[in-house]
Amino acid sequence: MEIYDTLIIGSGYTSAGYSASHPKTIICEEREALDTSFYLPLSGFCYHPYAPSSKDGARLFEIFNSLSLFEGDTQNINGFESAFCTYLSERELPVLLKCRVVSREVRDDGIIDATVQTNEGLTHIFTKKIIDARCKSEDKTLTVLFVADDATAARCELPRAFEGATVEPAFYKGRYALRVPVFGMDENTVKPYIYKKWQSLTSGAKLLFIAPAFRLSGDGNPMCDESYNNPIEAFEAGFFFEGGDEL
């Protein structure tokens, strides 16, 4: 029976950083993607410089640069998942996708018996510690990518159509990101709302893509990617993290 030192709930750069510096770690992620905080929600196209201080952080940074994901003050967040997967494969860090922790029980010897659900059914992972790296913030927005022949008109109309929304340039020229605040809706109900509203627009803005996940604000958890603006910074926060209790 294999016993891990740490089981991390939630895949991300902090999780990978922790796993890189703590070899007996396994990561469980409910979704089918690895970069769930930057890539999936298209969290930001503005690059915030960060210089890594660890060998692993430098290697991850090197992979990002090899794909030209950081250019000037912008970042191509669309390529983050590919870069992240390259690093994880290279380091052979254990990650279980579509894996959800459904229960946990502390045995008499102090080992945690975590029951997890995967595509193959229920199974058990035994670990000394669990870290929950998921963000619990209720402050969330949904990112909508669009193009417009008259960008000025679109940037004026969209924040009025979607109350509290903001518009920022995306990585590729001529594309923009609309950040729509989400209140009382889940990922399934908010998309029909977006589509319906979009049909009433008059500026000619063309919807390209709706992010499959919400963009969340950091909730103070140092093991949440959402607490950081740069993926390399998030990675090193996990790499140097030495928390003793479950987060």
Language-model-detected regions and their locations in the chain:
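N-terminal Rossmann-like FAD-binding beta1-loop-alpha1 element of flavoenzymes
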Residues: 2-27
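Residue-level detector of alpha-helix initiation sites
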Residues: 12-13, 33, 229
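Alpha-helix C-terminal capping segments
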Residues: 16-23, 67, 131-135
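C-terminal catalytic lobe of FAD-dependent flavoproteins
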Residues: 208-247
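Conserved N-terminal/central alpha/beta ligand/cofactor-binding core
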Residues: 24, 29-103, 139, 144-146
